[in-house]
Amino acid sequence: MAACSRTQVISLYRMLIKESKKFPSYNYRTYALRRVKDSFRENLHVDNPKTLDMLLNQARENLAVIRRQVSIGQMYTAQRTIVEETGVHRDL
C-alpha cells in the first residue's frame, strides 16, 4: 500500500467509526461499528491497487449510507433499550 493510499484508508476508517458512533439506536450502532472493524480487518493485507480502489469506493459508498441512516434514525427516535439505560441502578 502506498503512503498516500494508507492515509486515505486510515482517514476513511476513522470517518466510518465516527459516523457509526452517531447512531441513536444501540443495536444499529454496535452492528455498524462491528461491520466496519471486521471488514477493514479482513482486507488488511490487500496489495492489489485495483482491488484496493474498489474497496475504497465501496467504503465511501458505505459512509454515505451510514450518514443517511444516522440522519433518518435521529428524525425517528425510538425508546432506549435496557442496555442503554444509565443512572438508576436497583439492588435485587
Swiss-Prot record:
Disulfide bonds: none annotated. InterPro entries: Complex1_LYR_dom, Complex1_LYR_LYRM4, ISC_assembly_LYR. PANTHER family: LYR MOTIF-CONTAINING PROTEIN 4, PROTEIN C6ORF149. The lineage of its organism: Eukaryota, Metazoa, Chordata, Craniata, Vertebrata. Pfam families: Complex1_LYR (PF05347). Coiled coil: none annotated. One of its GO terms (biological process) is iron-sulfur cluster assembly. This is LYR motif-containing protein 4A. It comes from Salmo salar (Atlantic salmon). One of its GO terms (cellular component) is mitochondrion.
